[in-house]
């Protein structure tokens, strides 16, 4: 499988031009946004297609909890939604980035021999996780209004 990066010839001379051409041929912003979302998700799927579901799931969690924070009337409710969102999104990041490290250290510290899982790292997981976390925190702190459109939020994240 070809790895696609920004400096890859396939990206520069096929993927990017197709994205730009379709974007500028689109007549309205809704269609333009859909084109950008599709191309972003295709780009993310190039490494491992199954991880696009993780990106969409993480985005959906951020979107739902930001909306709940925005609609909540009490500070206690807002804080609860913020914490749940952080636990889920940072928890997913931790599972993918640090499970092997954690198991290796347990094996070194304790007289056990746990199998070290071979977990692939999703492309951009740190970037989009912190993008989501910062957005939800900004909604919590009233720095930004919660985005009411999931496609617009997904475009922001991806």
Where are these regions (language model features)?
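Membrane-embedded transmembrane alpha-helical bundles that form the catalytic cores
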Residues: 1-158
